[in-house]
């Protein structure tokens, strides 16, 4: 499990915005992952992602890493932000855009 923790840690810390999701941004394989992708794309946020369906160790490891039971999981500047419900709520209230801007992540438009 240490190798997967190192992989997760590297992705989270070396990318300003990183999304662990089911599927890919071009082809999300669950509705919740798709919602987060739509929000990030709407805001014009540059982000990287990993498909947890391709690796069982990653799928389980990310849950342990964040102590959060569900996927997708969004990280900004190394900080776990939340899953689909939290991201959607933050977006609807304008908090996600503000958080991204406060962290120095360019946002192309607001909600």
Which sequence ranges carry the predicted segments?
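N-terminal leader/targeting and pre-domain segments
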Residues: 1-18, 109-111
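TIR-domain catalytic/interaction hotspot
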Residues: 6, 59-64
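Local sequence-structure signature of Cys/Sec-based thiol-disulfide redox active-site neighborhoods
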Residues: 9-46
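Cytosolic beta-strand hydrophobic patch enriched in CBS
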Residues: 18-21, 72-77
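Thiol-based oxidoreductase modules, predominantly thioredoxin-like and allied folds used
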Residues: 45-59
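Thiol/disulfide oxidoreductase modules built on the thioredoxin-like
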Residues: 64-70
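Non-catalytic, surface beta->alpha helical segment in thiol-disulfide oxidoreductase systems
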Residues: 76-108
């Amino acid at each position: 499990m240490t190798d997967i923790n190192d992989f997760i840690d590297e992705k989270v810390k070396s990318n300003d915005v990183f999304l662990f999701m089911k599927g890919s941004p071009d082809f999300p394989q669950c509705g919740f992952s798709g919602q987060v992708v739509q929000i990030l794309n709407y805001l014009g946020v540059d982000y990287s992602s990993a498909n947890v369906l391709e690796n069982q160790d990653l799928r389980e490891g990310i849950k342990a890493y964040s102590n959060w039971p569900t996927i997708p999981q969004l990280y900004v500047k190394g900080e776990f932000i939340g899953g689909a419900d939290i991201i959607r709520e933050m977006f609807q209230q304008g908090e996600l855009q503000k958080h991204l801007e406060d962290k120095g992540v360019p946002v192309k438009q607001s909600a």
